[in-house]
Amino acid sequence: MELAIRTAMTTLGGGMLERLLAADPGYRGPGTDCGAGHQAEFVSYRDKTTGTVLGPVTVSRAWYHCGQCGHGLAPRDAELGTAGQTMSPGLRKMAARAAEAVPFARGAGLVADLAGITLTGKRLGRHAEADGRAAAAVIEAGAAAIAARTLVPLPPAGLPDKLYIAIDGTGVPMRAAETAGRPGKGEDGKARTREVKLACAFTQTRVDEDGYPIRDPDSSSYLATFAPAAGFGTLMAAEGRRRGAGHVRQLTILGDGAHWIWNLASQHFPEATQIVDLYHAREHLHDLGKLLAFMLGDQHDHWLAGRSGELDDGDIPALLSAARQFSLAGIKAGELDTALGYFETNAPRMRYKHFRSCGLFVGSGTVEAGCKAVIGQRLKCSGMHWSVPGAAGILTLRCQQASGRWEEIWQQPPSQSGAA
């Protein structure tokens, strides 16, 4: 009974909305600006059916044509946020929320079950990807303005003591056309994924009774992009400024040791403390132990335990000295140099005992969790293969949702482009 009443109320509401919109068909006189500085002339009234949260609604709008541009437009469409769209802003918002959360077909099913609106999975996905890309364009434009210093974000209210930016990357499965000609890690040497770079910014104001840092609840914000490192750096810098970098007492960059991460950190936040994720460093140490296992024999575990203690203390010179006591030749010698180079290069970022004494995080678990929760749970499901634009759109939606900024997407001014 209640669902039947809901259906009836939706139908009734759709009729009311249709009548309300009919009161202003958007006639703006015999001529109106086409958006490119020309005069578009009134032609006639034309009907357009748009999907809304109250079902399909048909509106008769004044239609103008610009002879110089060669295209038509309905001013009323731009005012309603439906220019070039087949869905209302309200329905697009609903569709995008479903599409960022679950696969498109399931999302369409959720919209049908929860709102009584019928959409195909393809239509839902197409609109969600487009709205995500539009949101990404706004974010990128804002980041460029911050980089150019034409926009200066105000520091957040209640400035935290410590701000962290943790950085990582993960592969997203792609359609063959998106990876053609790219080298990969598979046996055939072909790429099947494209790397998406992810940054997670979060704050900290206290430590627990044992002195371990505690992330402030609900303080994480995310950004993700397929752009090269330079583009990612611009976005990361803007997010850092928005979160208070330059005003907080302590800014820390966390990463896995990749050179591009530290290059960006030094470029955009030279004042920041740089820390290599301790757990990545431990993985490298275990790889070093495997490399030397044939020489260590039954002393392997004892030797590795000693080096682990040195790593946890940040005593990288002692670790390097212990490893260099072994004389290797040929390929093994080169592998040892590479393994030790990781610790040599990152030694200033591995002062873990000192960092912990300062109450700082030494692990990048937040961004690794983000790679799984924000990216993997939606874009890396079985059988999925994305286009870069499609994946980028959904990623933007997911980052905004995970960052608590969902409403910001829908606060942008409506498009002024010609109507479809």
Locate the predicted segments by residue:
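A broadly conserved sequence feature marking short terminus-proximal activation segments
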Residues: 1-41
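The −1 position to Zn-ligating cysteines in a subset of zinc-ribbon hairpins
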Residues: 30-33, 49, 65
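Short, non-ligating residues that shape and space the ligands of small metal-coordination modules
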Residues: 40-42, 75-76
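Catalytic center-proximal scaffold of phosphoryl-transfer enzymes
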Residues: 1-17, 61-420
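Short linker/helix segments within small regulatory modules
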Residues: 50-61
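Short Cys/His-rich metal-coordination motifs, predominantly Zn2+-binding knuckles/fingers
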Residues: 34-38, 53-55, 67-71
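A short, compositionally biased
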Residues: 28, 42-45, 59-60
